[in-house]
Amino acid sequence: MKKKTSLIIIVASVFIVFSFYFMFRGTRIKTGNREMLEATAQTEEIVHGIVIEQSFTNITEDISEIAIVFSRSYYLEEEANIVIELLDSDNNMLTNEKYNADDIKENHRTYLKPTNTISGYVGKQLTLRIYTESSAGTGLYVMYSDKDSKSSFLYGNEEIKGTICFSVVGKE
């Protein structure tokens, strides 16, 4: 009787393990549309009237968050904000968020987290857009890597060789 009970427990355990394997084998978390590059430079200060844009080809099926790294030179006496947007190739807004500039930490990741997961954009061109609505300066700079000479982004009307330090998190 004891052998029969042990055998049933072993068979049930194996069944449960295989069930979980087959249920979750297709679900993987992909951390990064590309690896976040090591910062080698920073843009000029983000000021009113300047829009920073980085286009990229998305490879993540379900986008759940995007991280961007900022640098800062000073904290403000007046309140200022930063807006981060994610747009599709037709300039349709997929998600956006406004941040108080003083809440953004030096060389830490700032996360753009859509309310709902963004799906259906694998292989599509997406654009990150960063700007301020404040009339004063922000004390913030976007970090980027200038090691990739094939890539570029816009700082206002100026094309800068390199890639903004960002990553995309989601399910593949």
Predicted regions and their residues:
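Surface-exposed loop/edge segments in extracytoplasmic proteins
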Residues: 90-99
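Beta-sheet-rich sandwich/jelly-roll-like modules and their strand-loop junctions
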Residues: 2-90, 104-125, 131-172
